[in-house]
Curated annotation (Swiss-Prot):
<keyword id="KW-0560">Oxidoreductase</keyword>
<keyword id="KW-1133">Transmembrane helix</keyword>
<dbReference type="InterPro" id="IPR000298">
    <property type="entry name" value="Cyt_c_oxidase-like_su3"/>
</dbReference>
<dbReference type="InterPro" id="IPR024791">
    <property type="entry name" value="Cyt_c/ubiquinol_Oxase_su3"/>
</dbReference>
<dbReference type="InterPro" id="IPR013833">
    <property type="entry name" value="Cyt_c_oxidase_su3_a-hlx"/>
</dbReference>
<dbReference type="GO" id="GO:0019646">
    <property type="term" value="P:aerobic electron transport chain"/>
</dbReference>
<dbReference type="InterPro" id="IPR035973">
    <property type="entry name" value="Cyt_c_oxidase_su3-like_sf"/>
</dbReference>
<dbReference type="InterPro" id="IPR033946">
    <property type="entry name" value="Ubiquinol_oxase_su3_dom"/>
</dbReference>
<keyword id="KW-1003">Cell membrane</keyword>
<feature type="transmembrane region" description="Helical">
    <location>
        <begin position="140"/>
        <end position="160"/>
    </location>
</feature>
<dbReference type="GO" id="GO:0042773">
    <property type="term" value="P:ATP synthesis coupled electron transport"/>
</dbReference>
<feature type="transmembrane region" description="Helical">
    <location>
        <begin position="27"/>
        <end position="47"/>
    </location>
</feature>
<feature type="transmembrane region" description="Helical">
    <location>
        <begin position="66"/>
        <end position="86"/>
    </location>
</feature>
<dbReference type="Pfam" id="PF00510">
    <property type="entry name" value="COX3"/>
</dbReference>
<dbReference type="GO" id="GO:0004129">
    <property type="term" value="F:cytochrome-c oxidase activity"/>
</dbReference>
<keyword id="KW-0812">Transmembrane</keyword>
<protein>
    <recommendedName>
        <fullName>Quinol oxidase subunit 3</fullName>
        <ecNumber>1.10.3.-</ecNumber>
    </recommendedName>
</protein>
Amino acid sequence: MEHAEHGNSNAPMEYQSETGRLNILGFWIFLGAEIVLFSTLFATFFVLQNRTAGGVLPDELFEVNLVMIMTFLLLISSFTCGIAVHEMRRGSLKGVVIWTIITLLLGAGFVGCEINEFVHYVHEGASLGTSAFWSGFFVLLGTHGTHVTIGIFWIIGILIQLKKRGLTPQTSSKIFISSLYWHFLDVVWIFIFTGVYLMGLGGL
């Protein structure tokens, strides 16, 4: 039983406990559901993208510089998140904490930029009720931004556990699972950047 619980000691730390392996498998299934959710939101957005109701158009409001900053912050955070997992596998608690905190700061910067963006759009007359396009836009990006915010608080909780328990197969599996979640959100953002912003800046 002990062997079954701890598994192969040569495996990455996050896979060394049966609980960790099952949690990782379960999270992959959860990500499948998330893919369905965002696919539905993207499909809805693309159906509504030309329905601006004669109101403000996306190319009149979208700001290239802000979008590029947001993209930079999130993509770099994916890189730093990957480094944190690498440090975890090296057994460096300090490295995990440092790179995870950097990831959180970059994520917080992204959320701050998105909130600023939304406030600006609403001030300029684009809101959920302005048109079908803006309704689809705010729901899609708001859902993504909410996921990023949840991820930030989730990872903060993992950092607290790391401080109390250190690097164990259990905490390592949580770090790895949170990294999968974070990378998934980065991939979703790439689709948002391409399908929403680039098309919007091109006048739909």
